[in-house]
From Swiss-Prot:
InterPro entries, per the entry: EutC, EutC_C
Record-listed E.C. numbers: 4.3.1.7
Protein name in the entry: Ethanolamine ammonia-lyase small subunit
Organism (species): Escherichia coli O81 (strain ED1a)
Record family assignment: Belongs to the EutC family.
Amino acid sequence: MDQKQIEEIVRSVMASMGQTAPAPSEAKCTTTNCAAPVTSESCALDLGSAEAKAWIGVENPHRADVLTELRRSTVARVCTGRAGPRPRTQALLRFLADHSRSKDTVLKEVPEEWVKAQGLLEVRSEISDKNLYLTRPDMGRRLCAEAVEALKAQCVANPDVQVVISDGLSTDAITVNYEEILPPLMAGLKQAGLKVGTPFFVRYGRVKIEDQIGEILGAKVVILLVGERPGLGQSESLSCYAVYSPRMATTVEADRTCISNIHQGGTPPVEAAAVIVDLAKRMLEQKASGINMTR
């Protein structure tokens, strides 16, 4: 599927929702104010700001314009300069700040108020707290007994597509991208004439939990939107794991199709929704997912 087809799907889905599709845009570095190298290392600078990300720490550069262009072209840690064999103070502080942000999003909880505000049913895995979630991934792959009963009682049975949202390893990925990915995704699936299950939120879920969900609800395709393990300074990245006719005993990782890096600096959520709709349709047509699908 090429870019033109993706844009057509996005326009079609957004039109059905009564919204205007966003204009196509190229992925660009979000840094600004890169006019010239800056050597000031003010302690008052917000280390998460665009100004801090645009900072060029190379002193007395031979070609300042080359550094400026390089800095504009990537979000990587380039042009930070050195103090002898060591990084400069601001570069080190930014590294530590980004590391702290990544740790925070792993340890944070998705607020119960947020889940209720979205009108989502909330269930959980066998995990009871964040510490256990990080140390016992096997328990995050199974629903607790109460969750199983709740799904049987409150969710649509035997859907063509079941959409599940889970916090995973990034709370920010869910709360930041939810509004831009779930409404167009649900609208696109319904517009395609598919029977769509009741979307719900799984707290402390791991990827393999979608196998049990699919088995309980009799879903043909299960789509799990889960927070990715955050990188330095990027804590908002979402992944989609889609699988056809999952079974706890037989489904393996090669049976899943993954779309990763869903966020404003990667694959935009609205565009990802269109790609996921197309993927679900192809899975149902081919009755397969993962490496068993024909490209």
